[in-house]
UniProtKB/Swiss-Prot annotation:
Quaternary context: Homotetramer.
Organism listed in the record: Geobacillus stearothermophilus
Entry protein name: Glyceraldehyde-3-phosphate dehydrogenase
Phenotypic consequence of residue 191 to S: In mutant D32G-S, a strong alteration of the affinity for NAD is observed. In mutant B-S, the recognition of NAD is slightly affected
Job description of the protein: Catalyzes the oxidative phosphorylation of glyceraldehyde 3-phosphate (G3P) to 1,3-bisphosphoglycerate (BPG) using the cofactor NAD. The first reaction step involves the formation of a hemiacetal intermediate between G3P and a cysteine residue, and this hemiacetal intermediate is then oxidized to a thioester, with concomitant reduction of NAD to NADH. The reduced NADH is then exchanged with the second NAD, and the thioester is attacked by a nucleophilic inorganic phosphate to produce BPG.
Residues that coordinate or bind NAD(+): 12-13, 34, 78, 120, 183, 315
Lineage: Bacteria, Bacillati, Bacillota, Bacilli, Bacillales
Gene this chain is encoded by: gap
UniProt-annotated location(s): Cytoplasm
Binding site for D-glyceraldehyde 3-phosphate: 151-153, 182, 197, 210-211, 233
GO terms under biological process: glucose metabolic process; glycolytic process
Amino acid sequence: MAVKVGINGFGRIGRNVFRAALKNPDIEVVAVNDLTDANTLAHLLKYDSVHGRLDAEVSVNGNNLVVNGKEIIVKAERDPENLAWGEIGVDIVVESTGRFTKREDAAKHLEAGAKKVIISAPAKNEDITIVMGVNQDKYDPKAHHVISNASCTTNCLAPFAKVLHEQFGIVRGMMTTVHSYTNDQRILDLPHKDLRRARAAAESIIPTTTGAAKAVALVLPELKGKLNGMAMRVPTPNVSVVDLVAELEKEVTVEEVNAALKAAAEGELKGILAYSEEPLVSRDYNGSTVSSTIDALSTMVIDGKMVKVVSWYDNETGYSHRVVDLAAYIASKGL
């Protein structure tokens, strides 16, 4: 029986989680909460500038969405405590507003009747951070109720960092994510607490911070203090790429590094990590459902122990599929 899911925040990630859930028989979205009317939500769900028209019948009945004949309750509550998830049978809430990333705030969904909360972002004081393919085995249904799915960039980096560390040992590394612009930037020059993000997103390459590299330690504790990095926001609407330069414990060749990554992509990390030897560009990865695709043509090694690994990710679609996978995994372990 499908687990019943509510989505709080029907923005870029919320709607992409919904799209991903439509393809997963183990997930049933029964309600969404957003401070917008149902007609607007229906239009934005059906028509997407990045991912195209949704292959589903979408309409509105009163204040609710109707997708492929199934009615989905639409709420418009500012405070999660007032959502009464329990009354409508919601088991798991996907918290994707970006506003309730502290445990005490996200836990209000539990008070409203949900059994588990998945925060679709890095969180503070969460019960556990999980990256699928890396540390989902650490999930304890009795102890973990507010779970972070980390960031899209951590979901890209952690799987191949795991492979590199297990096979060759990572001494230290620096990561740059060349990242498409997001809603946390300004479309034209306007005030922002980060003065670089205050600048027009489509007009510049914008250096900014990311906690993604350090956050790998939350799912791979053995890498604590060994990774750091930054972001370069670029004028594309979707798809990003991680560039990791790391010092390894063992001497390697390009062929050995690629062979290890390819084996993982075809084996234990299939569906999470992919491997490509084609000369592709970012547009080719739009719609990719995996967390990370190794660009094997870009792998480099200097002096045996210094390695560069480049990996692509659809920072919307891939990440949203992992949110859905995590919800299904949590449900499979018992709520």
